[in-house]
């Protein structure tokens, strides 16, 4: 069953668009309506004065209402899988019997103590979505993905292929180093997927590490004339880093068009790429890893 992309869902109706000026105008209109008709025009003129003490009271009251409505919005988002974060997401995960994984345990022997590195909200949210797949006993792709991802916090991604009937190949991408899964991690995943309540009797499961395809990015930015170039370069690097991180998953291609799009931030006139020179197309058992990226400015064309 395909996973719904929560980022593509429309904003929920329960979350209200807030506007201070609209709330203040409603407050003023309500106050004016409380006066007799022959006094309403004079009160309305008074409320147009910013220095009027009554206006200050209404502004303070409107601001408090704005804060309260925002708190209601936050409370509504906190119970939605698409919006919840942190402890709120942990509570939602408990409803699906899916807990957040520990990537690196806490170390109390250091000074100061090193806190544990936990699974990110994005990865945890995906596993929660797949929780019902984990109930399947028919060996579905989703079930193998769920149990594989839940086996260990070091698992960054899982792919499931069937090269022949009753043969299942599980490729594991690790969060450690460049993504190659260690034998220790493969053993943990193998044990998790061979449980009697997970693997159908007829399935023969092979667990292997993802094949890592390394690449580099070397780009030159040509800018429109302006006083400073470094903020523009920094913005381009930030978007490029986000793209590199997002594509470090199984089966995600590295496309030149996407690199150009990431680097074309406000202020960039054109981009020249020295590397890569072609798209890097991957299958579901492969993952990319950027060993180095270099973004420099080449001045202005004008």
From Swiss-Prot:
Compartmental location: Virion
Record has Cell cycle as a keyword: no
Chief localisation class: virion
Keywords: Late protein, Viral baseplate protein, Viral tail protein, Virion
Signal peptide: none
Induction, per UniProt: Expressed in the late phase of the viral replicative cycle.
Superkingdom classification of source: Viruses
InterPro entries: Baseplate_assembly_J_pred, Baseplate_J-like, Phage_Baseplate_Hub
GO cellular component: virus tail, baseplate
Pfam family, one: Baseplate_J
Similarity comment: Belongs to the P2likevirus gpJ protein family.
Function: Baseplate protein that may be part of the wedges of the baseplate.
The protein, known as: Baseplate protein J
Gene: J
